[in-house]
């Protein structure tokens, strides 16, 4: 499937928003709802990891196709339907300009085409989607294929912000693009700070931190300077939660009133977690989330206690 054909399938973010949701109609709180978060489908990593060649490996991705198909089937069976399905980056393993990237992308788009048309997809960029040090060209390629790399949208009175976390990791090759996101983010946080929304939530690929705001710098988190500056901005604006991936394990912690949620992968696991998805229920007062293995969600769906929250 070409990028143009994919455009007919996905409500891709354009103009820094997602047209699947009307910002005018969705700005008011209408009661509890839920969404599903996934991360790191990363077609190709399981083969690359198994052979110890993560840089040049990844010439097979049949396992990831089957796992993502299982995730889509599980989501489609959910009742009531989630408001949306967000994929928090590393959609494919092949970096920009490397072998198998087009094939991996085409296969992922084909699998995602099966998501129920009433469940919009929200696509977040990861380091494998843009390169560890993105350029204007790699960002443009992502935008053409999947939609804007950062944007905001409203659902039921909740403001959702999607960030390009590679700009926070290494923007040395595209400083002007980072500045543009920074300026845009300040504008969005101003809306949240004025309490014009019931809650405000951020999606990005790389976590601010894995367990603690004061932890050491690591491949899997943002540097202390960057994370502390961003965490202060987010908490000052009243952001309630940041949902991310990248770690291929479940993790997370809190900073002041901010919940940092790190979800394991649909694809390759690097720890002891199972291939899975996170269900996130939003009520007037709280945000409750739970990670399910693909088998659990396929067979049992959302548990009754979470469903009860949706009736409040």
From Swiss-Prot:
Domain of life: Eukaryota
Subcellular location, record wording: Cytoplasm
Chief localisation class: cytoplasm
Translocase as UniProt keyword: no
Catalytic activity annotation: O-phospho-L-seryl-[protein] + H2O = L-seryl-[protein] + phosphate; O-phospho-L-threonyl-[protein] + H2O = L-threonyl-[protein] + phosphate
Record bears the keyword Cytoplasm: yes
Cofactor: a divalent metal cation
Gene Ontology MF term list: metal ion binding; protein serine/threonine phosphatase activity
SUPFAM superfamilies named among the record's database cross-references: Metallo-dependent phosphatases
Binding site for a divalent metal cation 1: 90
Enzyme Commission number: 3.1.3.16
UniProt-listed Pfam families: Metallophos
Binding site for a divalent metal cation 2: 90, 127, 246
Annotated stretches, region: Catalytic: 47-250
Modified residues (Phosphoserine): 2, 293
Gene Ontology CC entries for this record: cytosol; plasma membrane
Free-text remark on how the cofactor is bound: Binds 2 divalent metal cations.
Keyword set, alphabetical order: Cytoplasm, Hydrolase, Metal-binding, Phosphoprotein
Matches recorded under InterPro entries: Calcineurin-like_PHP_ApaH, Metallo-depent_PP-like, MPP_CSTP1, STPP_CPPED1
UniProt family annotation: Belongs to the metallophosphoesterase superfamily. CPPED1 family.
Stated role: Protein phosphatase that dephosphorylates AKT family kinase specifically at 'Ser-473', blocking cell cycle progression and promoting cell apoptosis. May play an inhibitory role in glucose uptake by adipocytes.
PANTHER family: METALLOPHOSPHOESTERASE, CALCINEURIN SUPERFAMILY (PTHR43143), SERINE_THREONINE-PROTEIN PHOSPHATASE CPPED1 (PTHR43143:SF1)
Name of the protein: Serine/threonine-protein phosphatase CPPED1
Organism whose genome encodes this protein: Mus musculus
């Amino acid at each position: 499937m070409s990028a143009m054909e994919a455009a007919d399938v996905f409500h891709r973010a354009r103009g820094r928003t997602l047209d699947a949701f009307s910002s005018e109609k969705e700005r008011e709180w209408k009661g509890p709802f839920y969404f599903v978060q996934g991360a790191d489908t990363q077609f190709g990593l399981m083969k690359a990891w198994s052979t110890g060649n993560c840089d040049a490996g990844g010439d097979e991705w049949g396992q990831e196709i089957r796992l993502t198909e299982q995730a889509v089937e599980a989501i489609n069976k959910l009742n009531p339907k989630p408001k949306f399905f967000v994929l928090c980056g590393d959609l494919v393993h092949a970096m920009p300009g490397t072998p198998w990237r087009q094939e991996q992308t085409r296969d992922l788009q084909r699998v995602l085409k099966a998501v129920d048309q009433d469940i919009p997809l929200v696509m977040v960029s990861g380091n494998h989607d843009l390169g560890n040090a993105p350029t204007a060209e790699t960002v443009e390629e992502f935008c053409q294929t999947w939609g804007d790399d950062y944007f905001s949208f409203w659902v039921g009175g909740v403001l959702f912000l999607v960030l390009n976390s590679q700009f926070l990791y290494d923007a040395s090759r595209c400083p002007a693009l980072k500045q543009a996101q920074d300026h845009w983010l300040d504008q969005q946080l101003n809306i949240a700070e004025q309490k014009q929304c019931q809650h405000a939530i951020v999606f990005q690929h790389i976590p601010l931190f894995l367990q603690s705001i004061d932890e050491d710098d690591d491949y899997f988190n943002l540097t202390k300077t960057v994370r502390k500056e961003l965490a202060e901005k987010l908490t000052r604006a009243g952001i309630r939660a940041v949902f991310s991936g990248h770690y291929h394990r479940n993790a997370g912690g809190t900073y002041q009133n901010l919940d940092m949620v790190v979800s394991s992968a649909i694809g390759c696991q690097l720890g002891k977690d199972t291939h899975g998805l996170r269900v996130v229920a939003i009520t007037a007062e709280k945000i409750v989330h739970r990670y399910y293995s693909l088998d659990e969600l396929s067979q049992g769906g959302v548990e009754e206690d979470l469903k009860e929250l949706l009736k409040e």
